[in-house]
Amino acid sequence: RRILHQLIRKEGVKLNNLTDIKSMTLDELTDFVTENGFPKFRAKQIYDWLYKNVTDFDDMRNISADLKTFLKSSSYISVANIEKKLVSRYDKTVKYLFSFNDGECVESVVMSYKHGYSICISTQVGCKMGCTFCATGKSGFSRSLAPSEMLGQIETAQRDLNIRISNIVLMGMGEPLDNFDNVVKFLRLVSSDNGLNIGMRHITLSTCGIVPKIYELAKLHLGITLSVSLHAP
C-alpha cells in the first residue's frame, strides 16, 4: 500500500502541469476546446461525460480520436477514491476517507434523513485555523481542495451508495472561507443545471468566522445558508 501511495503522489506531481478539466465551468471548457482548434459542440459532449462519472477520456465514446489525444496530453480528470468506509450500526451514517490524484486524503460523511440524504464535505486537506475543539487543525495544513475534488466527494458517495444527495454541508476538514475562490466556484458548479443541479438553498457553509470573507460572500447573493461556529478562536 505504501508503494501504491508513493506512485500516486508521483503521478500527482506530473498532474500539476495539466489542466484540471472538471474544475471548469461549461463556458470555460468551451473556450478551452475552441482555443485549441476543436468545434464548440465538443465542449458540451465532454462536460456531459464528466458528469456521468467518466474518469478516462477513452471512455468518451462520441469524442473524436484527435480530441482524446489532445485531452490526454493537456488535461486530467480529478477522482475521489474510497480509501476507507465506516457505517454506523445505529443510523447507517457513512463516513468516508477519500484520496485524490496526488495521494492526499480527506473525510466526508453521508447522513440519511426523512427528507433525503445530506453530505458533509471537506474543503481543504488539514486546516490553518487552529480551533481547539477540532482534530483537523492538530494535523497541520497541506493544501486547499480544487472545485473538482469537492464535487468528487459527492459523486463518489452517490455512486457507492446508489443514492441521490440533496443537501450539502461544507463542514468537513478545512475552513471553506480560507479557500474562498475554489469554494465559490464549486458552489456554482454543483448547483448548475449542467452539473449535479443541487440548489443553493440546499447548501450550508460552516465557518469559524473570517469576517472579511463573510462580507465578500454576502455580496455574491448566492442564497446558501451560512453557519458560524461560536466556539472558534
Predicted regions and their residues:
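Basic polycationic patches enriched in arginine
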Residues: R1-R2, R9
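Flexible, acidic/Gly-rich N-terminal and inter-domain linker regions that tether
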Residues: L7-Y117
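Conserved Radical SAM active-site core
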Residues: E104-G223
